[in-house]
């Protein structure tokens, strides 16, 4: 009986433990933090998020922000994982609905539909920019004033990112790309996750343009729920440009229609099921070397 109990705990530890950014690129993974620790602040800040939903997400601390706030994540691993999918919310801190939708999707990922084969290893980072989310008022940029979605190391970043910021945005402080690529702990953490987790699909949740964007190989989804494909172009230092165009990893960018309100629960479910079916049909064979999962 004692050995059985030890085996159960070992299995649980393996489920919740996964590679994090190395010490050279990201703060050391915090330890001894209860999984429900962020829920008080998140429930008070995010739309359509109740404590029960947040606590059921079983978030695990994995990194720290500029101000030392914890960045949390959750892995959901099937019995026979094939496709690896990284889902990221709140890269921009004032897009509160993006974090809320990520939390709702964690619940749905743990309750897969019986008619859809499940061989997907999900990794969720619902709030990449906690300093921006928890600022009063929330801010697009992180605590250093950097737009994290312009801070990834796309080719010719040193030249193009600054020119784009100066010429195309008129030095908009909300879109400052930072002093150099990966200058921020939040972008370094996500960059390291792209290396260590090696996702075959990245889903980046934003707001408020109400469209579906796509970068990279494969045939993009035509719609997720009521969001239809409308490829808006790429920007120096963006996750879509870096991941989809430069690294060849499909990046689906979900642009919710409102930053402060989530879609209705039924709509979030439909978006999720559409994403799940598209990923299984279009990307499943890629993850299994050309074999149907």
Go through each PLM region and give its residues.
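Short beta-strand-to-loop junctions in surface cap/lid or active-site-entrance loops
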Residues: 73-81
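Active-site/substrate-binding loop(s) of hydrolase catalytic cores
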Residues: 82-86, 96-231
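Conserved beta-strand scaffold positions in the cores of enzyme catalytic domains, especially
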Residues: 59, 73, 124, 202, ...
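Bacterial N-terminal signal peptides
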Residues: 7-17
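Active-site-adjacent mobile loop/cap segments within catalytic or ligand-binding domains
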Residues: 211-216, 221-225, 237-293
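Short glycine- and acidic-rich boundary segments immediately preceding or forming the N-terminal edge
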Residues: 22-71
